[in-house]
Each structure stands twice: as C-alpha cells, then as structure tokens.
Amino acid sequence: MKRSMYAGRVREEHIGQEITLKGWVGRRRDLGGLIFIDLRDREGIMQLVINPEKVSAEVMATAESLRSEFVIEVTGQVAAREQANDKLPTGAVELNVTALIVLNTAKTTPFEIKDGIEANDDTRLRYRYLDLRRPEMLENLKLRAKVTHSIRNYLDELEFIDVETPFLSKSTPEGARDYLVPSRVNKGHFYALPQSPQITKQLLMNAGFDRYYQIVKCFRDEDLRGDRQPEFTQVDLETSFLTEQEIQDITEGLIARVMKETKGIEVTLPFPRMKYDDAMALYGSDKPDTRFDMLLQDLTEVVKGVDFKVFSEAPAVKAIVVKGAADNYSRKDIDKMTEVAKQYGAKGLAWVKVVDGELNGPVAKFLTSIQAELTTALSLEDKDLVLFVADTLEVANATLGALRGRIAKELGLIDNDKFNFLWVVDWPMFEWSEEEGRYMSAHHPFTLPQEETAHELEGDLAKVRAIAYDIVLNGYELGGGSLRINQKDLQERMFKALGFSAEEANDQFGFLLEAMDYGFPPHGGLAIGLDRFVMLLAGEENIREVIAFPKNNKASDPMTQAPSTVALKQLEELSLQVEEDETSKTN
C-alpha cells in the first residue's frame, strides 16, 4: 500500500484516521500480551501497538518475529495514548495495527541505532549507512540541506549565477599537495583535482558573468585533523566591480539569513573587524575566539631590567592571566602545558601564582623588583595564575594563543551557545616558510596588494599587505577572500616576487596572463567552508559528523576500502608503474 505519511509526523489531528506507515523497527517490547514497536523513519519515531484480540494470528506471529532494524509496513488506526510521552513529537498518539508486512529482515547491527553510542570512528565509518540512521546524524544532514537551500535562495535573490567549473584541471604550485589524475589519452600528463575553483571563477568575471556562485567540492592532499577532509565543500563566490566592503556586506547578509532560517538566531550586523596584527597580538591567533577574555599581554619592556636573562634578553615576553585559577593547576598540570608550549616552538613556560598578595612560583624571585608594575600591567588579583613565554614574537603569540584556547575549554570559560563572528583584515601578503626557505603567498598569488605597499614587491616582502579578509566564527576560520589582481604587469610582478621565472609563470599560468590582455575587470570574492559552517551550527567538533560519507584520519574510507589497488591492466593503459617501498618488500 502507499505510505500515508512519515511516522515521525503523525499528530493528534490524525486520531481516528487509518494510515499506512513504513520504516525500521527501532525497539520491540512485549507487555501484558501486547506488543509495542517503535517504528523509525527519517522524521522520527511512532509507537505501534499490536493487540492479539484485534489482529489475526498471522499478524501476531509476524509481530513476534520482528527484530531491531527489520523493515516493515504497517496499517492501522491512529489513537490517543493513555500516557503521553512528552519526549517525542509523536508522544500523544500511537497506531493500533491491523496489518503488518515484513519488507526485509536485518542482521544484528555492530552498534545500536541510537544517539550517544560508544562505537569507534572506524566502525561507524565501516557501517556508515547504519550510522546515518541514528537521529542525530539524520538531523545533522537535514541541517546541512537547510543551510545550502538558504544559501542558494539568498544568492539567487542577489542575481548571482550558479556556474559549474571543471574538476579535471591543471596542477599549479603555491598551495597544498594536489590529487593527481593520470591521463590515458595524453601519456605522462596529469590532471589535478581542484583545491578551489579560484582561477576559473576569476575567468568567469573576465567573461562578464559579474556575480558567480557555486557550492562545490574541492580537494587537498594534506594532513588531516578534526575540521579537515581530503574532499570538502565550499560556498564559492566571485563578483566584479565591487569593493572589499561590498563583498563583506553580501557575505554578512548570507550568514545572517542562514542563522535566522536554520537556527532562529538574529545576528548583529555589521560584524566586528580586527586587523591581523591585532588578532595575533591579543589572541595569538589569526582566527581569534572572542567568546572569552584572557588576552595576551606584552611585557617585553616591563621585564627588561630584571636579573633573569631568559626574560631580559628575549626578543619578546608575553603573558596570559588565568583569573582565579591558581588552585586549579598543580605543578604537574603546568608541566603538561609546558610540553604543549614546546610543540609550538617555545623553549619553556614560566609561571607565577598570586597567593596572599605575593608572587609564588619558580620565577617569582626574579620578579620581586617589578611586582608592582606587573600587578598594574596585568591587573593581578589574589589566586591569579600567570603564564609567560619568552621567545620571538611569533612563537610567544602562537604558544600563548594555543594555551589560551586549551585553558578556556578546561575551565569551562566558553559559552557554547554564542556565535561570535568577526572579520580579520589587513593581512600580510606573504608568509615565510621555514620548510621552503622562502616567502609564500599567505592566501594565494592572485590577491591584490594594498596600493601603498605594492612597491615592496621588489623590496621587503614582509611589508606587503593584502586586500584580504577572513570571516571567523568562534575560533574557526569560516572562510576567506580578497580583491584580485586584474592587471597583467602586477600579476607578473607577484609571480616574480614568489620566485617564479618568466618561463615558469607562463608555463603554469600563461592562460591567466593572456586573459588579462582582454579587458579583465576589477573583481574579488570569497569562499566559505560549508562543512565547517554546518559543524559549528550543529554543535559538533568534527566535520565528519556533518558529511554523509567522509574519510578517516588516514584519508581512507573503511566502508568501500578506498583508496585501493587497481588491476595491472589499468596501470598499463595509463603508462604507470607502482614502485614498492621497503616496507612492502619486507612484509
């Protein structure tokens, strides 16, 4: 029979109606001769009642055979429950079953189909189709669908045009590693899966599309963590003739629409703006979490005269004050934080506690002469814990920024119901790579430099500033964008500053440079990480929880066993050979 409605949508207004439902057996209970079944579908759970006095012996026998995750079809009359269940939207009603058909049976599942399970991640991914039956996973993906629907409606209203760009593209330097796809037709040549549609969307501006968007898959072969995947989805925008402020206004409107339509939250516009240098100086991060205080304090000048060379001779000395936390952290706890500090390049972590108005701790004796100055500079009170890092400014900022976030989580200082958006602006154009031994693009090599610093492309690259902007939410980079270069000579200067010869630039980006000979308009855009945005809206800590079929931390899919080896014939068609590493040879 045709399904009448979703099980999770049956309500009191349906009492007395005969309906047909289809779904999965969530739970079966035998009570006083009656059989109760929780029928589950994507919209929720509906209680079924099978009464032996009101059904045939065949229906009763079928009901007794039911097990968890059997797929069934039931017909019956909706009735009011004697005792309502306030925890369920369907809790005021039940279905008195008159007909029951088993559509399919099921083996015992490797974990219960319910929220809050303790199965490990690889087991969940191995049986992802079962994991996705769990209500919280269904809700996460329904939220994702609502977010994308809201985004599309908003951008359509603003006359953005949805254009698909190629997945098989050209491998270019300056970024994460590419996923390469060998060409069978062009032996020895490779496509790359795009890390973003950056160049193609710029070319669409040259083509006159004016406002482009796409909700698009992107690919990066990089080390994974909780908020990264090898394939991810971004909301990609590009516009012509708009200023930085106008692009940010559009983005804020998009986010405000999504927040209102999916979470019922009215966000305050415009979002705060913070310069990159201020974010690093005060929060130790280019994606500051502004839901709590504990700002970084610069004590370099204050400690210059102390008889402690670690402080007095350091390029920078910075500190954070953990208010009232002196008793929360033992020496052993601080030793653990010291190990964290070393991961960020710090040589160590100095600390003092304020106890009865005096400084206590390993370095307290060196600070006695400046206790009054420290107390004033840091607004110290009894029971405060002060953590110091003496190192380069970059190391001090990064270390204390990381500890700031860690401590806030440990002490419960973060209001998880807050959504604090802000723009980080006025970025450096380049960042120094120790691994490469050279300056690299902080964003990408197509970013427009600020006019007043562009002359430093042939001078001190550290002084070049970009017309770039990142949108940050609760300590996560939600997205980023910039105005782009549209003048050929400036683009060539940018490539040269990055160490490209004219031949290398032409080989890698000749098609873009050629396009700049044909009236390339001023343009700029932005991309928002959809997975990360939905993760934060859903209150999750890992983007795997909002992606239907993600990879694990080894970039593998335990369900399909991808990536996998392929037949020798397929490799031969591609003129490829796989060399065994030493580990493979010994196993």
UniProtKB/Swiss-Prot annotation:
Catalytic function, reaction form: tRNA(Asp) + L-aspartate + ATP = L-aspartyl-tRNA(Asp) + AMP + diphosphate
PROSITE patterns the UniProt entry points to: AA_TRNA_LIGASE_II (PS50862)
Gene Ontology molecular function, alphabetical: aspartate-tRNA ligase activity; ATP binding; catalytic activity, acting on a protein; nucleic acid binding; transferase activity
Residues that coordinate or bind L-aspartate: 174, 220, 443, 484
GO terms under cellular component: cytoplasm
KW Cytoplasm (keyword) present: yes
InterPro entries given in the database record: Aa-tRNA-synt_II, aa-tRNA-synth_II, aa-tRNA-synth_II/BPL/LPL, Asp-tRNA-ligase_1, Asp-tRNA-ligase_1_N, Asp/Asn-tRNA-synth_IIb, AspRS_core, GAD-like_sf
Subcellular localization(s) per the UniProt record: Cytoplasm
Positions annotated to bind ATP: 220-222, 229, 477, 529-532
Superkingdom to which the source organism belongs: Bacteria
Listed HAMAP family: Asp_tRNA_synth_type1
PANTHER family associated with the record: ASPARTATE--TRNA LIGASE, MITOCHONDRIAL, ASPARTYL/LYSYL-TRNA SYNTHETASE
Subunit organization: Homodimer.
Functional summary from the UniProt entry: Catalyzes the attachment of L-aspartate to tRNA(Asp) in a two-step reaction: L-aspartate is first activated by ATP to form Asp-AMP and then transferred to the acceptor end of tRNA(Asp).
Protein family: Belongs to the class-II aminoacyl-tRNA synthetase family. Type 1 subfamily.
Protein name (record): Aspartate--tRNA ligase
Source organism of the structure: Streptococcus pneumoniae (strain Hungary19A-6)
Gene: aspS
